[in-house]
């Protein structure tokens, strides 16, 4: 990551405040004099797909990130945006990290406006990496493998990491910091 690169960190349902790894990543980038945006998306505990898509479009237009790091529902949000005809007007980003994407057929009432979600044809990123856990309650490894195959992207499967969030012990997470900050 060069000093000029801008990193946008997008949380999932409920946010990703400290001690979540996304909050730690934002702090690590800032401590290294990097440029980071870690916005709180509208009504994160009761999200609306349409409101989040609109907000993300505004963020992309204003911030113009080089790298985007999505956790959970933020990955689904990215899929929805990539399926929009107006996405072609937004410049392709350099890197996209998708951590713990939920199944595209997730059935949870509070986030039902996001599902089912069709996988986009294009992720609008030059490099994409997906990281999941083998015991994530929101996606099976088989579906993650299918997604990775469709997009022809690398998939990292971590053992017993749950939903890769603070509840499963992922506060400071060196792997994602190293990948995003290009130390690996």
Residue spans for each PLM region:
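Conserved alpha/beta-hydrolase "acid-adjacent" motif
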Residues: 107, 137-143
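Catalytic active-site module of serine/aspartate enzymes centered on a nucleophile-bearing elbow/loop
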Residues: 169-184
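Catalytic histidine neighborhood in serine/cysteine hydrolases
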Residues: 34-37, 148-165
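Catalytic histidine-centered segment of alpha/beta-hydrolase-like enzymes
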Residues: 47-49, 161-173
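Short beta-strand/loop motif that positions the catalytic acidic residue
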Residues: 123-125, 129-132, 136
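Active-site nucleophile loop of the alpha/beta-hydrolase fold
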Residues: 12, 40-44, 96-106
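Gly/Ala-rich beta-loop-alpha elbow adjacent to hydrolase catalytic centers
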Residues: 68-79
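Active-site catalytic motif of lipid deacylating hydrolases and related acyltransferases
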Residues: 3-64
């Amino acid at each position: 990551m060069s000093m000029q690169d801008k990193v946008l960190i997008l949380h999932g349902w409920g946010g990703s405040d400290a001690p979540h790894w996304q909050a730690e990543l934002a702090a690590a980038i800032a401590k290294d004099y990097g440029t980071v945006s870690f916005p709180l998306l509208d009504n994160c505990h009761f999200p609306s797909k349409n409101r989040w898509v609109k907000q993300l479009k505004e963020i992309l237009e204003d911030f113009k990130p080089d790298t985007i790091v999505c956790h959970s529902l933020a990955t689904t949000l990215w899929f929805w945006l990539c399926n929009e005809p107006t996405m072609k007007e937004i410049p392709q980003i350099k890197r996209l990290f998708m951590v713990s994407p939920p199944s595209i057929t997730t059935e949870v009432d509070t986030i039902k406006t996001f599902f089912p979600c069709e996988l986009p044809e294009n992720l609008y990123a030059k490099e994409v990496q997906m990281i999941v856990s083998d015991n994530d309650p929101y996606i099976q490894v088989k579906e993650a493998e299918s997604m990775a195959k469709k997009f022809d992207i690398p998939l990292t499967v971590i053992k017993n990491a749950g939903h890769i969030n603070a509840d499963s012990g992922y506060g400071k997470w060196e792997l994602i910091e190293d990948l995003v900050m290009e130390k690996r």
